[in-house]
Amino acid sequence: MANQSTETNQPSNMQTYGVPIYAADWIPEVDVRSKIIMDPEKSEDDDESSSSSSSSRSCIVLSGGGGEGRSGISNVILICRVDLNTNSLSEQPLGRLVVGSDLPYRMAVHPREGGLICALPNSCKLFHWEDIMSREDNQAGESEEVIKELRDVGQQLALAFNPEGSVLAAGAEDGTLRVFKWPSMNTLLNESQAHSSVKCLTFSESGQFLVSLGGPVCRVWDVNASAAVASLSKEKDEMFASCRFSVDSAGNEVLYIAANTERGGSIITCDTKLWKRKWSKPIKKNSISAFNVSADGKLLAIGTLEGDVLILESTRMQTIQVVKKAHLGLVTALTFSPDSRGLVSVSFDSRARLTMIEQKGDKPGVRWWLLVLLIVLLYVVAYYYMKAKGIIP
C-alpha cells in the first residue's frame, strides 16, 4: 500500500493540485538535471548516475484550469516531482505558472531540450522550463513565446513532436493539419480538410509517418512526401478515440487505435506495411477516454469515462492490472515513465495518480492449478507402477 500523505488522508501516490487537469507528460531527464532544481542543498558534484538517483529526479508537467470566465480556478502549468522508488508524487508543485484566462488544453513536450508547447484557445505558445520554475510572481510574462505560425489559428486539439524533436504537428478543431520543421517552423504540410476535427496525432518511431485521427477516419501521412498515403476507416459503430505508434517484440512498428462502441471500448492493432487492421481486442463495459503505450512497447494503458485505469500486456492484449475508481471522473490523460515502471493518470477531479506497474509473476490461482495437476499426475504414475508390480489387482 502506498504511504499516506503527511497533510491529507489520501495516499502519497495520489495528489490533488486544485485545478482540472487536461494534459500530462514526463519531462526529459536532461532538462530535469540542467534546468529544474530538484534539491538546492544537494551538491552538483554528487551526480552519480544510479537507478535510485535517476528516479529521484523524475518530473512530470501538468496543464489545466478553469478556462475563461469567472470560475475562480486559475489556468496553470505545473511541474511536479515523481519518486518511483517510494511510489509518491510531490504534495506541492515544484513550479507553478499561471497563464491568465487562456486554458492550456493540450501540450507537447520537446523530447530533447526544447521546452513545452501548449495549445491555448486561439494560439500555441512555447514555454521554457526555467521560466516555469523561476518566475517569482507565478505569472506568465513576455518570455513565453506565441508561435507566429500558430497564432490566431483557433483551438488545437492535438500537438506532437516526432521522436527526434525535429518536426512539430498541430491538429485543429476545424480539421486543419499543420506540420512544421522545428525550430525553423518551415511548413511541411498544411491540409485544411484533413478531418472534420483533428482529435489525435502520433508519429512513427522512425519519424517517417504521421497518423492523424478525427471522426470516423484515421489518416496516414508520409512526412517527407507531405502527402497522405493511406486511410483506415471505422467499422460498424466504432468511434476512434486515440492512436499511438509503438514497436513490437520483433522490432516491427505497430499502430494501435483506441475506439469506442456501444458495447464498450476496443484496441485495434494495425499493420504498418499494408496499413490494414490486423485484429481488435474488445475492452468490455469500459468506454475509453485516454490511451497510451509504454516506451518499451510492452504495455498499453487505458483510462475510462468511469475513472478506472487498466494496464494491458501489448502482445496478447491481456489485462494485467486494474485500478478501479482511480479518479472521481473521466481520465483525461495517461503517461508512462520513460523506464516503463510507472504510469501517471490525471483527471477533471484535479488529481494526479501514480500507479506502479506490478512485476510479472504467476497468480495464486495458477499456482494452485499447477499443484493439483502435479498431484494428479503423481497419483496416475503411482497407480500404474503398483499395478505393474502386482501390488494392487
Swiss-Prot record:
Give residue spans on the Lumenal membrane side: 389-393
Its subcellular locations are: Endoplasmic reticulum membrane; Golgi apparatus, cis-Golgi network membrane
User: Membrane side Cytoplasmic: which residues?
Assistant: 2-367
Bilayer topology term: Single-pass membrane protein
Q: Name one GO molecular function term.
A: guanyl-nucleotide exchange factor activity
**What residues bear Phosphoserine in this entry?**
43
Sites bearing N-acetylalanine, chain numbering: 2
A Pfam family the protein falls into: WD40
Which residue windows are transmembrane per the record? 368-388
Q: Name one GO biological process term.
A: protein transport
Ranges occupied by WD repeats:
151-190, 193-231, 283-322, 326-367
Keywords, sorted A to Z: Acetylation, Endoplasmic reticulum, ER-Golgi transport, Golgi apparatus, Membrane, Phosphoprotein, Protein transport, Repeat, Signal-anchor, Transmembrane, Transmembrane helix, Transport, WD repeat
Task: Give the residue ranges for region: Disordered.
Answer: 41-67
Q: Name one GO cellular component term.
A: endoplasmic reticulum membrane
> Per its UniProt record, what SMART domains does this chain match?
WD40
Q: Which InterPro entries match?
A: Quinoprotein_ADH-like_sf, Sec12-like, WD40/YVTN_repeat-like_dom_sf, WD40_rpt
Q: What does this protein do?
A: Required for the formation or budding of transport vesicles from the ER.
Q: What else is known?
A: In the process of transport, may migrate to the Golgi apparatus and function in subsequent transport events.
Note the subunit structure: Interacts with BZIP28.
Protein known as = SEC12-like protein 2
Q: Which organism is it from?
A: Arabidopsis thaliana
